[in-house]
């Protein structure tokens, strides 16, 4: 074991947790460690969230890719497995978002996270009922806006992050957000070990959030052969592409992504053909495709070209992450995928990160 696995010289509180790792976020979330497992669509199900919660971190359920009934069942399953706090990720543009919010309140879910900023009235409703509100931000101005609306914390994701992401790296974005708001800030984008946690705390953040690193655990339900592709991907093996749904998204470079990059989605007929081709691959019904597309068009400022692919993007990811159909080729990932080389359990991962962080903090004291 290298020096980062040691924690000699550091003190612990009465509950065995290093007080240097107790932050505004750990108090707000009710967890032992300032580590968050993000609500990755089709990945962060009850098993992963439960394992994360039992390890002392905050697991977030990916309800944004679930139906209302699936979300209710998933929350019940997590509740049956652990009494530790956890969170649920919601889509603000979902037609039934109000019902989802009501269910989170009824079930006393600790945290509601959002990829897009929730409306001010939704923030107020959740807060008034004891639910912590934490949206993701990719720019200082976004953080300032949601802070004015009263959110409890923000998850600040730099361009190293997976899935939909911005253009500013964490090292530049995080200090800006920290200077802009007075609520706890969770740093995301490129984090995968205890050195990153120690660095984030040194910056002034209240913790770190990780997606890809938790995807690559033995508790993740992603098929083993899909995990193998992730483990074989180099640091240079990812690309930020707008070819999937019109918005910048970091994915593993595959033949399908390369084809989409060459084809583009600049013209509706071509985009429609791509969407229909992928609909056949993913066996998505035309009705579901149209319903998803019209919902996105109504709630987001998308062109019809973007709608044509965006409507099917979630199904492309599902076919890969759930069914293991690599021929679809949509593999969202953070840039840290190139330096991850094992599949620990969530308990092993969190313990390792905590030990490494304590060791780094010792050397910086």
Per-region residue spans from a language model:
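Active-site entrance/lid segments in N-terminal catalytic domains of soluble metabolic enzymes
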Residues: 1-4, 12-184
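Gly/Ser-rich catalytic serine loop of serine hydrolases
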Residues: 41, 188-194
């Amino acid at each position: 074991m290298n020096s980062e696995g040691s924690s000699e010289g550091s003190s612990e509180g009465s509950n065995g947790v290093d007080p240097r790792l107790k932050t505004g976020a750990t108090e707000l979330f009710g967890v032992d460690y300032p580590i968050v497992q993000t609500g990755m669509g089709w990945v962060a199900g009850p098993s992963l969230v439960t394992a994360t919660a039992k390890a002392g971190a905050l697991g977030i359920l990916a309800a944004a890719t679930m139906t209302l009934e699936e979300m209710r069942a998933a929350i019940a399953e997590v509740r049956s497995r652990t009494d530790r706090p956890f969170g649920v990720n919601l889509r603000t543009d979902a037609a039934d978002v109000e019902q989802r919010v009501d269910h989170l309140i009824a079930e006393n879910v600790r945290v509601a996270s959002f990829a897009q900023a929730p409306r001010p009235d939704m923030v107020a409703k959740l807060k008034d009922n004891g639910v912590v509100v934490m949206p993701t931000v990719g720019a200082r101005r976004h953080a300032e806006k949601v802070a004015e609306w009263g959110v409890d914390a923000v998850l600040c994701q730099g361009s190293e992050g997976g899935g939909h992401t911005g253009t500013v790296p964490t090292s530049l974005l995080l200090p800006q957000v920290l200077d802009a708001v007075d609520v706890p800030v969770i740093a995301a984008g490129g984090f995968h070990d205890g050195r990153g946690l120690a660095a984030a705390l040194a910056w002034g953040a209240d913790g770190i959030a990780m997606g890809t690193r938790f995807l690559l655990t033995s508790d993740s339900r992603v098929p083993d052969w899909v995990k193998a592709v992730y483990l074989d991907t180099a640091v240079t093996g990812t690309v930020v592409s707008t070819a999937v749904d019109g918005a910048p998204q970091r994915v593993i470079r595959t033949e399908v992504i390369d084809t989409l990059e060459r084809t583009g989605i600049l013209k509706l007929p071509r985009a429609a053909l791509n969407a229909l081709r992928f609909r056949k691959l993913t066996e998505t019904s035309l009705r579901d495709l149209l319903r998803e597309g019209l919902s996105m068009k109504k709630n987001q400022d998308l062109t019809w070209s973007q709608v044509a692919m965006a409507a099917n993007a979630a199904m492309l990811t599902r076919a890969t992450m759930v069914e293991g159909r690599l021929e679809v080729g949509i593999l969202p990932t953070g840039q840290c995928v190139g330096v991850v080389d094992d599949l620990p359990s969530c308990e092993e991962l969190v313990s390792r990160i905590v030990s490494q962080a304590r060791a780094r903090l010792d050397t910086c004291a």
